[in-house]
Design a protein with these regions (language model features):
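Mature soluble domains of exported/periplasmic/lumenal proteins and thiol-rich metal-chelating peptides
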Residues: 47, 57, 64-65, 70, ...
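A solvent-exposed, acidic/Ser-Thr-rich amphipathic alpha-helical stretch
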Residues: 52-116
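Short, ordered coil/turn segments that flank beta-strands lining enzyme active or ligand-binding pockets
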Residues: 20, 60, 149
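Low-complexity, intrinsically disordered terminal/linker segments enriched in charged
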Residues: 152-171
Length: 171
């Protein structure tokens, strides 16, 4: 009887260790994902508002993966800042799809890591001028955002046919 009781207590203790040790990282990753999703919601709001606050969500060493035709492997925050400010001067942006953020995973471990992914649709418009009519185009994109432990965006990639959208607006 004493041996059975010891075995049962040992099994319960082992199960508790497994349960609590497995539950903590998932809970931590879930909390990081929720916090990072809120950051991305604000990033999108700042982008639509053409606000310099947009850039404050990124670490100074943040990079974007070059995903366009013949794009460089990485694009720095400084380069993106110049490009986005020029684009804001020329175009208006509106997120027209719901923000259904998806949890990302670590590429090596495949474990949920707090990164944020999603499929979004943006309306990009160009105002009329004396010689042109107003135009707009909808572009569907896949975007991902990886964060450092301080909640700053470190890595971003955007896949979508943005070049075709801009070409249409500028023709």
């Amino acid at each position: 009887m004493k041996q059975s009781l010891t075995s049962i207590c040992g099994a319960v203790a082992a199960a508790a260790v497994v349960l609590f040790s497995c539950g903590q990282p998932a809970s931590d990753a879930s909390a990081k994902f929720e916090a990072n999703s809120a950051t991305i919601a604000q990033v999108f709001a700042d982008f639509e508002a053409e606000s310099d606050d947009f850039f404050t969500h990124f670490n100074a060493e943040a990079v974007w993966r070059g995903t366009g035709l013949n794009a460089p492997d990485t694009v720095t925050l400084e380069q993106v800042t110049a490009k986005y400010k020029a684009a804001w001067f020329k175009y208006d942006y509106e997120l027209v799809s719901p923000t259904n953020f998806l949890p990302g995973v670590n590429p090596q471990t495949k474990a949920v890591d707090g990164s944020v992914r999603g499929y979004f649709e943006w309306n990009i418009s160009k105002a009329a001028t004396d010689s042109t009519e107003a135009k707009s185009v909808r572009v569907k994109v896949y975007e991902s955002f990886d964060f450092n432990p301080d909640g700053e965006i470190m890595y971003t990639q955007v896949y979508g046919n943005l070049a075709a959208g801009y070409a249409y607006l500028d023709e």
